[in-house]
Amino acid sequence: MSLDISQFPVLAQANTPNELRQLPQALLPQVADELREFLLKSVGISSGHFASGLGTVELTVALHYVYNTPFDRLIWDVGHQAYPHKILTGRRDKMHTIRQKDGLHPFPWREESEYDTFSVGHSGTSISAALAMAIAAEKEQAGRKVVAVIGDGAMTGGMVFEAMNHAGDLHNDMLVVLNDNEMSISENVGALNNHLAQLMSGRFYTTLREGGKKVLKGMPVIKEMAKRTEEHLKGMVVPGTLFEELGFNYIGPIDGHDVDALVETMRNMRNLKGPQVLHIMTKKGRGYEPAEKDPIGWHAVPKFDPSLFKKPATKPGLPTFSQVFGKWLCDIAEQDEKVLAITPAMREGSGMVEFSQRFPKQYFDAAIAEQHAVTLSAGFACEGFKPVVAIYSTFLQRAYDQLIHDVALQQLPVLFAIDRGGIVGADGPTHQGAFDLSFMRCIPNMVIMAPSDENECRQMLYTGYCYDAGPSAVRYPRGCATGATQVEAMTALPIGKGVIKRVGKRIAILNFGTLLASALTAAESLDATVVDMRFVKPLDVDLVKEMAQTHEVLVTVEENAIMGGAGAGVLEQLQKLRMPKAVLQIGLPDEFIKHGSPEEVTHDLQLDAEGILAQINAYLAQ
C-alpha cells in the first residue's frame, strides 16, 4: 500500500532530482520536513532500516539540489541511510515494497536506478569507488563531480584510510561527506561553525589561499609560517587535522540538519580543487523521539504504527540462534576467565549484550574492522587465552586472509561463532551467508561444524571451546531456533562424527545444518535414511562410506553454495574411495540470492521440505 502523496504537497513536486532543483531554495526546509514524514510512514508500512535515514534527510535534499545527479556521481557507504535518496530519485511510489520479494532493493543498487552509481551493503567501500570515478571524470574531462557519503561508524575500517591516503596522494577533485551522528549537535556546531565553513569554502578565501601559495613559493620560511597560522586558526574550531594530514582539505563540522547551510557550503565546495572533506553533525532518528532516544533499537524495524511511538511487542517464542550463542558464552565465561569475546561492531546482532555487561573485561568490540578482529583473536590465542570471534558469515569474507594467514596457518585455537549462515532474507545478496562453508572448507587445520538445532549448537560451541589443535567454526542461521529440548550440561562432541536420525531404504540424505527438519519430512515420503552429518570438516568418512555401500542414491542438503560446499566434500571423499555413486547436491545455486522473506527465499530455492522432496523425485525420474 503506497502513501497518498497529496498529503505531502511540496514533496509531490520533487519526484526526481531535476524536479527538486526547479524548486526555490526557500522551500527546501519544507521538502525536508515532508520527506522525513513520508519516510516515517513508509517504513511503518514496509519495515526496514529506519533511524539512519531519518538522520540524512536534509543532507540528501542538499546533495541532490546542489549536484547534477545522476551526471554527478553520488555514492552512499553501506546504504542504510539511503532511503531518502530512493524517495527523491523516482522510487517514491515503490517505497512500500522495499526489502520485500520483487520489491525495491534494501540498499543502493546499480540495476535498480541510474542514480545508484555503486551497489553497496558492506561498509567502507564508498571512498575507493569515488576515487576511481573522480579519476575517470578527469580523464573524460566531462566536468563531472563525485561525492561519497560515509558515516562515522564506517570510518573505523582500514579500507577507508587506505582510500583516503591514495586520494590525498593523487589529488583528484572529489568530496567526502562525513556524516557524524555519534554525538548530538553541540553549541560549537551552530551558527559560528556554519558561517566559518561557508567562509572557508568560499571563492574569496580559496582564491586568497591559492594566490598566497604562489606568492610565497619562493619564500619557504614565510610560507611555512603562513601555513601554520592557518592550521592554528582552523584548529581552534575545526577537528580536521587527521584529514589534512591525509591530503584532504577539511571543512566543518556543520549542522547536518540545517539544509540552507548545507546547500551554501556545498555550492562553495563544488568547485574546489583536490580532495575535500565536509564534516556534518547529524542525529540518528531525527524527528521521531523514540528513535532519537534509542537509535540502535530503531536501526531496523518491523512494520509499526508511528503514532503509537513504540515498536510492536514481540510475541514470546523460541530463542534465536544468536541468543543461544549469547547464553552459552555467558555460561562458559562463568567457568573460565580466559574466555575472551571479540566482535566487529555486532554486539546486538550477535547476542552479546548481556556478555558485554556482565564480563566487560573479557569483551572486545573491534568496531567495523573484521581483519583486525580476527588477528586480534590470533594474538590472544598466542598468549594462552580462549578467543571467541562472533561474526556474521557475510562479514567473515572480509577477513579471509587473516583467517588463513594469522589463525589457521599457526594452528591457533580460535573459535568462530558464525552467525547468519545461509539465507538471511530481506537484506538480500550482500548479506546472504552463502559462501562460508565453501571458503573455509579448503583451509587446512580448520574444524567446521553445522548444528541442526539449538542444543547441538550449544554442544558444538563447547566442542570448539575445548578443541586446542587449531581453529574451529560453528555456523548457524539467522532467526529462531527449532524448539529442541536444550540440555544445559555441555559435552564435547567426537570430532568428525555424524549421527543417523532415520533409517530407510535406497536413498540416504546427508544433512548439514538446520535444514534437518525439512529433510526428515521429505524422507517420510521417500522412506529415506537421514543422517545429521554435524561436521563439514573433518567429514565422517566412515559414515559416508557406509551410506554409499547400503544405498543407491545419496543426497546432500546444505544452506550454502553447492559449489565447493559440504556436498562437494562428500563427492571428493567418494572419488577418493573409488566409489562411483549417484549423488544429488541440494543447496544454494550458482547465483547471488535476491532479497525476500527467509520463508519465500527458501521456498523459491526448493530448500523447504516440499522443495527437497521435489528435487529428489525429479532426480530419480531422470
From Swiss-Prot:
Gene3D superfamilies: 3.40.50.920, 3.40.50.970. It comes from the Bacteria. One of its GO terms (biological process) is 1-deoxy-D-xylulose 5-phosphate biosynthetic process. The keyword Membrane does not apply. Its EC number is 2.2.1.7. SUPFAM superfamilies: Thiamin diphosphate-binding fold (THDP-binding), TK C-terminal domain-like. GO terms for molecular function: 1-deoxy-D-xylulose-5-phosphate synthase activity; magnesium ion binding; thiamine pyrophosphate binding. Catalyzes the acyloin condensation reaction between C atoms 2 and 3 of pyruvate and glyceraldehyde 3-phosphate to yield 1-deoxy-D-xylulose-5-phosphate (DXP). This is 1-deoxy-D-xylulose-5-phosphate synthase. It comes from Shewanella baltica (strain OS185). The lineage of its organism: Bacteria, Pseudomonadati, Pseudomonadota, Gammaproteobacteria, Alteromonadales. The gene is dxs.
